[in-house]
Amino acid sequence: PYRSVSKGDTVSFGSYEQDGNTSNGPEPITWIVLDKIDGQLLLLSADVLEARQYHHVPFEEVTWENSDLRAWMNGNFYEGAFTPVQRGLIETVHNENADQSITGASGGAATDDRVFALSETESVIYLNTPAARSDIGAAPASVHAAAGPLSVSEDGTADWWLRSPGTYGFATQFVDATGVPSLSGANVDLQYGVRPALWINVEGIGEGSR
């Protein structure tokens, strides 16, 4: 079913608690197809699935490589949201983590990730028009995510983390509830929304490079 999809389509892949009712089990995750390159799809969760800190230590300079958010995405989320067969479709990608474009705050070392938050560069590419910011950038928070310490707008949307540094090393960029990226960022210990991103190989099972 994934081979025929186009950029901008939505697909269902994996499952995660979203409706706030754990007794009925996790709900299928809906993803937006941000890109399609050589039989591989870049997926971004359509909704804010969780509220989490980027890192738990206030005012500690931290990059994506050593962040709590990266550990959670590639640990508990990856292992819990996808079946073994689905995990076989998820590519391990080599992410370059560029410095902040204005202040030069360090983006840290390159990382090999199965699941990741989008970068400043990716936000520029995929949220480059008002339509993209409203259609893709502004993300509704799931009932589960909104039940925590997440600030949710009147429209039901929430701020969500990128992985790139903000003005300082203890701040991280995010996309606000209206879909507009914030270069200056927010302190890493704040509870912001999480929208996992990943590449899947729709040509077959197994790892590779994009």
Feature map (PLM): residue ranges:
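Collagenous Gly-X-Y triple-helix signature in extracellular proteins
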Residues: 1-210
